[in-house]
UniProtKB/Swiss-Prot annotation:
HAMAP family: Ribosomal_uS5_B. Pfam families: Ribosomal_S5, Ribosomal_S5_C. This is Small ribosomal subunit protein uS5. GO terms for molecular function: rRNA binding; structural constituent of ribosome.
């Protein structure tokens, strides 16, 4: 078992990922440029990276082959990570996020619910370490904008203690809505 884990960690280190980071490839697209000799293809990859305990980021990489584009995206994602507060495997409160035409609502769920989400939003939640959440996306179904809208929503999350500190109150004095 540990041998398999070491192989996986070595693979992550070769790709430029730190040990302990989870990555999910959300989208790979192929672009064709027409040149005199025919078509020249290039690839773009969208990757979500997280540590499974509240850190998550996204990256977008382009190259002439798929593996280098994924590696570039992983490197960019590991540099753009944000912290997401987690409460018992879920999020502290309901929150909306938006990016372009994408609208995403994230709703906390009880233990055992699982991740109820589309493919792009699910990748972000899994990389972040969320186990129980309800989500709904509105507007576009473009995975790139859905990931950005999800991360916008996650950046707005605050714990009870953070809200109390902003208001200059004791966390016990806050009234649940």
């Amino acid at each position: 078992m540990s041998n398999a884990r070491n192989k996986r960690n070595n693979k992550n280190e070769e790709q430029g990922l730190e040990a302990g980071l989870l990555d999910r490839v959300v989208k790979i697209k192929r672009c064709a440029a027409v040149v005199k000799g025919g078509r020249r293809f290039s690839f773009a990859a969208m990757v979500v990276v997280g540590n499974g305990s509240g850190q998550v980021g996204w990256g977008y990489g382009k190259a002439n082959e798929v593996p280098p584009s994924v590696q570039k995206a992983q490197k960019q994602a590991s540099r753009s990570m944000i912290h997401v507060p987690l409460v018992e495997g879920s999020i502290p409160h309901q929150v909306w996020g938006r990016y372009g035409a994408a609208r995403v609502v994230l709703i906390p769920a009880g233990a055992g619910t699982g991740i109820i989400a589309g493919q792009a939003v699910r990748a972000v939640c899994e990389a972040c370490g969320i186990h129980d959440i309800l989500t709904k996306s509105y507007g576009t179904n473009n995975p790139v904008t859905l990931v950005k809208a999800t991360l916008d929503a996650m950046s707005k999350l605050r714990t009870r203690e953070q809200i109390a500190a902003l208001r200059g109150l004791n966390p016990d004095d806050l009234i649940e809505a």
